Design a protein with these regions (language model features):
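Short amphipathic alpha-helical segments and helix-helix/interface helices
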Residues: 77-81, 104, 138, 157-158
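Active-site glycine-rich loop that binds ribose-phosphate moieties when present
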Residues: 123-142, 148-156
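Electropositive, gly/pro-rich neighborhoods at or near active sites that engage anionic ligands
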Residues: 1-87, 97-99
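Long, charge-dense
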Residues: 79, 83-133
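Glycine-rich, acidic loop regions that bind phosphate or pyrophosphate groups
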Residues: 148, 152-173
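Alpha-helix C-terminal capping/helix-to-coil transition sites in glycosyltransferase folds
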Residues: 57, 142-143
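Hydrophobic beta-strand scaffold residues
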Residues: 61-62, 87-88, 114, 167-168
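Short, ordered loop/turn segments at secondary-structure junctions
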Residues: 67-68, 91-95, 172-173
């Protein structure tokens, strides 16, 4: 399974979806999985159920999409967004327009209709973040009550929490 994930990420890198740093983040996560035994424990199972409940109860859920998500599971993330009526928003730590367009193209190819995060006129700044992830869409993460943020870094989680949002994060390993 690990080799398949690695191949999908390398393919995603070659297609312009994944940043070099995204390859490293995946490798770092895999190292922890190997050390911890790659099992979903009882606490994690409870967290998954709680996250699912939060998503079903959300009034304005948004799924933040990065290159790793677009490379590894675009079909599944689009399906999830439709099932829970969540908006999809491209929000990147290492951002450039070419990469955003490649991610949007991949999501659309997998059934997404509307994808936020590429219209500069809709951009707002989320206070408390120094990286490019501070730029969010006024109709997406900025107004969301629940935000799904795969491969999360702590500063954005803290900023989203301070903005009154419920944050759901998970590791793609």
């Amino acid at each position: 399974k690990s080799l398949l994930i690695r191949e999908k990420l390398v393919e995603g890198f070659d297609e312009g979806l994944v940043a070099k740093e995204g390859l490293l983040a995946q490798g770092r996560g895999e190292a922890f999985d190997y050390l911890l035994g790659e099992k979903t424990g009882k606490a994690a199972t409870n967290a998954i159920k709680t996250a699912a409940a939060q998503l079903l109860l959300a009034k304005m859920p948004v799924i933040s999409v990065n290159g790793n998500i677009a490379a590894l599971c675009p079909k599944q993330i689009v399906r999830l967004s439709k099932q829970i009526k969540a908006k999809l928003e491209v929000n990147l730590f290492y951002t450039n327009e070419k990469r955003k367009k490649a991610i949007i193209k991949t999501l659309k190819k997998n059934g997404a209709n509307e994808i936020l995060g590429s219209n500069n006129a809709s951009s707002r700044k989320l206070p408390g973040i120094d990286s490019a992830r501070r730029i969010v869409d006024k109709d997406g993460i900025f107004v969301a009550d629940v935000v799904v943020v795969p491969l999360e870094d702590g500063d954005r989680t803290m900023a989203l929490r301070k903005a009154g949002k419920t944050v759901i994060t998970f590791d793609l390993n």
